[in-house]
């Protein structure tokens, strides 16, 4: 199907271009989202009449998106999820979760603007693209952790593997200290059980002096 693009569409074309697309793509996405019109004589004439207005509207919305993008770009949002010791989530983080996390921090982000190839299924910091306008894209970070404390550690640059290694090392240190304490206590008990040194009999000493 031939359509007239009413705005820039990634990997397809710029505003005003007539492009050929699959009918399903046009019917299910481009036309209902008002990103394109059927390329017929009437619509071509209508587009030419509205072209100046469409370009002005596009410029205004792009400026708004750029202003928001300057604030949103590089922001990190924390999402708390349950996960195994290996870092695998019990569930996943979706585009809806990403949009809600950003919105909760005061940014107006619709889930349709979040470009996530597949749901996130592991702890860690994940980079996600947000498309604010056909010509404005920014990256944000999702800090997926099991607790706010873990999120802070991840934000400082530590991975889930680093955290697990530190916890294991701490556990081994505590066990070693426990055995040291037990060993020290055993030595004290041995000292208490040792027989007292024999004391000289005063009477025998007196007898020796008389002789």
Swiss-Prot record:
Annotated segments matching region Disordered: 180-211
Keywords assigned by UniProt, alphabetized: Ribonucleoprotein, Ribosomal protein, RNA-binding, rRNA-binding
Any GO CC annotation of this UniProt entry: ribonucleoprotein complex
Gene Ontology biological-process annotations: translation
PROSITE patterns, per the entry: RIBOSOMAL_L9 (PS00651)
Example of a GO MF term: structural constituent of ribosome
SUPFAM superfamilies, per database record: L9 N-domain-like, Ribosomal protein L9 C-domain
Entry-linked Pfam families: Ribosomal_L9_C (PF03948), Ribosomal_L9_N (PF01281)
Keyword Calcium: no
Cystine bridges: none
UniProt function note: Binds to the 23S rRNA.
Family: Belongs to the bacterial ribosomal protein bL9 family.
HAMAP family, per database record: Ribosomal_bL9 (MF_00503)
Name listed for the protein in its UniProt record: Large ribosomal subunit protein bL9
The organism's taxonomic lineage, starting at the top: Bacteria, Pseudomonadati, Pseudomonadota, Alphaproteobacteria, Rhodobacterales
Gene designation per UniProt: rplI
């Amino acid at each position: 199907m031939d359509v007239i693009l009413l705005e820039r569409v990634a990997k397809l074309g710029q505003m005003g271009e007539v492009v050929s697309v699959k009918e399903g793509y046009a019917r299910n996405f481009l036309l209902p989202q008002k990103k394109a019109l059927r390329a017929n004589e009437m619509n071509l004439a209508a587009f030419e009449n509205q072209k100046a207005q469409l370009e002005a509207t596009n410029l205004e919305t792009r400026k708004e998106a750029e202003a928001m993008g300057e604030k949103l770009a590089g922001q990190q949002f924390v999402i708390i999820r349950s996960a195994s010791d290996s870092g695998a989530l019990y569930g996943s983080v979706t585009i809806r979760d990403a949009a809600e996390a950003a919105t909760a921090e005061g940014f107006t982000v619709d889930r349709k603007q979040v470009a996530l190839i597949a749901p996130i299924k592991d702890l860690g910091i994940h980079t996600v693209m947000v498309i604010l306008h056909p010509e404005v894209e920014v990256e944000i970070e999702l800090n997926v952790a099991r607790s706010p404390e873990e999120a802070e550690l991840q934000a400082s640059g530590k991975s889930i593997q680093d955290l697990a290694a530190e916890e294991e090392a701490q556990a081994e240190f505590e066990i070693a200290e426990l055995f040291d304490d037990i060993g020290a206590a055993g030595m004290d008990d041995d000292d208490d059980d040792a027989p007292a040194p024999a004391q000289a009999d005063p009477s025998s000493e007196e007898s020796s002096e008389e002789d």
